Amino acid sequence: MSRLGALGGARAGLGLLLGTAAGLGFLCLLYSQRWKRTQRHGRSQSLPNSLGYTQTSDPGRQVMLLRAVPGGAGDASVLPSLPREGQEKVLDRLDFVLTSLVALRREVEELRSSLRGLAGEIVGEVRSHMEENQRVARRRRFPFVRERSDSTGSSSVYFTASSGATFTDAESEGGYTTANAESDNERDSDKESEDGEDEVSCETVKMGRKDSLDLEEEAASGASSALEAGGSSGLEDVLPLLQQADELHRGDEQGKREGFQLLLNNKLVYGSRQDFLWRLARAYSDMCELTEEVSEKKSYALDGKEEAEAALEKGDESADCHLWYAVLCGQLAEHESIQRRIQSGFSFKEHVDKAIALQPENPMAYFLLGRWCYQVSHLSWLEKKTATALLESPLSATVEDALQSFLKAEELQPGFSKAGRVYISKCYRELGKNSEARWWMKLALELPDVTKEDLALQKDLEELEVILRD
């Protein structure tokens, strides 16, 4: 029995040993197969790209296998794989998105470069436009530095004149010598010297031009001093020019333009004289009436007002200075705010009163006063309150005040203004005197249209004909 027990124990130990060996062999086989599979997969695998996917080496189709983005736990974890067709669709879409992004980036770069070029063009155009406006403004301010050919051939409203009626130095009535003649000769000599000295340095040219300008300023100041010190002799020199300017002012539209150019061309010589300055202001007023451009109207009115102010600085005893200063205040007020218009209206009345006090026989001053009174009498309640708040003394006038001023102008010079007769008829009608209104309406119809105000009141005249019909 003991021998049988020992034999059974030995067999059990042998079976246990064989089982253990078989288990170890099976585990080694599994490990070897898995290691070989891993090696084959490692050889066929490419490096992951920026999107975190790899390509297989299948020769039939290039299929992308999605991988997990590397994280803190390493690269071991793999997303649950999609079906092969699903992976292809997803990756095709990703490829399309990438292609679209590249194309979009290229278009953005092209658009950015084109915008830079467009911005440069816009800046260049704006700069050139501003420089051109500055040159036009300088030409308008200082037309006497322009060459003779510019004044007769320019299409600008500032220098429109017919070639047949152009006034040159040789054709001037009094034989006076204008500043343009001297300036033209100096410019011609400057051009000849510049043509002969092309090798001169830029600095030398600048110094030469500066010296030339200094000489011109000294010559102008010397001429002005000579005119002031000359007394009667200076008046004799400028008198033909002033008479010619007055004659052109009384003429047609072309004559007024020529008168404006004539005065501008002689400002350098006679710009220190009061009788010259108020005529220049009057010429600016004429140009303000003639032009249709709103910005040009305002520019003419502003420049003319400055000339009238310069004339008043020479002395306060000239009725014409006050008169044309008032006119230009009214013209400039048409382009200003209501506050500035009210202030300009007060200044208008003040200077018209001074003009009447200095020259009580001037029908134009009474006409302007009548028109001011008529407009003030028709101010709205809000406008009157605004005027009262802005001014120490409120504006006040009646239709009767306007009528008396218009009648005074007609008394001093019958038929002075068609617009004046229309205003008289309107005043009489508003005062309930229809027979007088009808009479003055007929008198107004007898006069031709001379000014733009006459044309503007034509509609009022037609309405009066209908209202006052017998």
Swiss-Prot record:
The modification Phosphothreonine is found at residue 160. One of its GO terms (molecular function) is microtubule binding. Phosphorylation at Thr-160 of the FFAT motif activates interaction with MOSPD2, VAPA and VAPB. One of its GO terms (biological process) is apoptotic process. Residues 36-470 are cytoplasmic. Residues 191-201 have a biased composition (Acidic residues). The chain crosses the membrane at residues 13-35. InterPro entries: RMD1-3_a_helical_rpt, TPR-like_helical_dom_sf. It is a single-pass membrane protein. Residues 220-231 have a biased composition (Low complexity). Keywords: Apoptosis, Coiled coil, Cytoplasm, Cytoskeleton, Differentiation, Membrane, Microtubule, Mitochondrion, Mitochondrion outer membrane, Nucleus, Phosphoprotein, Transmembrane, Transmembrane helix. A motif (FFAT) lies at residues 157-163. Residues 92-124 form a coiled coil. It is found in: Mitochondrion outer membrane; Cytoplasm; Nucleus; Cytoplasm, Cytoskeleton, Spindle. GO terms for cellular component: mitochondrial outer membrane; mitotic spindle pole; nucleus; spindle microtubule. The modification Phosphoserine is found at residues 44, 46, 50, 57, 183, 193, 212, 232. Residues 1-12 are mitochondrial intermembrane. Residues 167-231 are annotated as: Disordered. The transmembrane region is required for mitochondrial localization. Belongs to the RMDN family. Involved in cellular calcium homeostasis regulation. May participate in differentiation and apoptosis of keratinocytes. Overexpression induces apoptosis. Interacts with PTPN2. Interacts with microtubules. Interacts with VAPB. Interacts (via FFAT motif) with MOSPD2 (via MSP domain). Interacts (via phosphorylated FFAT motif) with MOSPD2, VAPA and VAPB. This is Regulator of microtubule dynamics protein 3. It comes from Pongo abelii (Sumatran orangutan). The gene is RMDN3.
